[in-house]
């Protein structure tokens, strides 16, 4: 009987090992192919590219599995990859076309057909380059774009170094919502050459990538194009605040107030920088309100002045451009005394002059009376002698 029990235990052990081994063997045999026809497509949107692919071969064998794709992409020479996991057969994103683009993708299987484990295919890779034309020096220089008051976009640039006199540049732009890239139709010119662009009203262009390409033409050389990506809300330059007021509440507290800049920017989107001067001391502070209370360092200070400038804050953009400074608003201490002194000085001068003239006239009048008196006295004396 002991031998029979031993044989049964051995049989159970053998069956378990066989089942476990078959499971390992089945998992080891599960393989999936990478996606087919992986490519990077440029639709002509100045940097907004399509990454697209087709399902892998022999996918019918894995109907009980979830099929996903892990996509990695970046500009060449970038330090890190962007990673996306999707069930779709395409993905879209923006790239800097001044550099090349590289991407890779593989298939991921999850579910019953893999006994709960994850199976990955090998990588499929793709790259994209715009064929470089012209020397690097022919590209425009010092590209600068400002979205004035969240209403008017203006871009300006300088010509490339060493370009021939017949070289001229053209600007194209695109953002999501436009059917195709558009060329600037209002160039800023200098010596009949394009050095900037004033854009028309840009409908629904906020909080989107705004793509710009500035290329050039010349009969004597190729011109290297330049590509840029902006977020317009991050390059807004507001108007400066106006209607500043400075009120001294008491010997210590000062109230500074100004109006919200005019235009479409909501009041909640502003941050203000205040430059405050008390006699010869100047300091700077910021606030998100259009009013601030500060304390005088000395109750005997004679002059208080301040200026304000505005910028879009972090609640409405990632960055921004400070406005110009407002006009200065000042308060001067003991102004009534100064006013009194200034008003009394001319009066005192005139009064003194009148007094001097009166004294002079009085003096002359006295002398005249004396002369008349002495003359009459002498005449009277002579009459008595002859009488």
Question: Residue spans of the language-model regions?
Answer:
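Short beta-strand segments within Ig-like beta-sandwich modules, predominantly Fibronectin type-III
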Residues: 80-89, 184-193, 283-291, 322
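Conserved aromatic anchor
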Residues: 47-63, 151-163, 246-247, 252-267
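Extracellular fibronectin type III
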Residues: 22-30, 109-136, 218-238, 313-341
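Cytosolic C-terminal tails of single-pass type I membrane
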Residues: 355-387
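N-terminal Sec-dependent signal peptide, specifically the hydrophobic helical h-region
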Residues: 1-37, 65, 70-76, 101-104
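Beta-strand-rich modules
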Residues: 2-11, 17, 76, 90-120, ...
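Extracellular juxtamembrane "stalk/ectodomain stem" immediately N-terminal to a transmembrane helix
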Residues: 228-229, 233, 246, 251-253, ...
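Single-pass type I membrane protein transmembrane segment
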Residues: 338-361
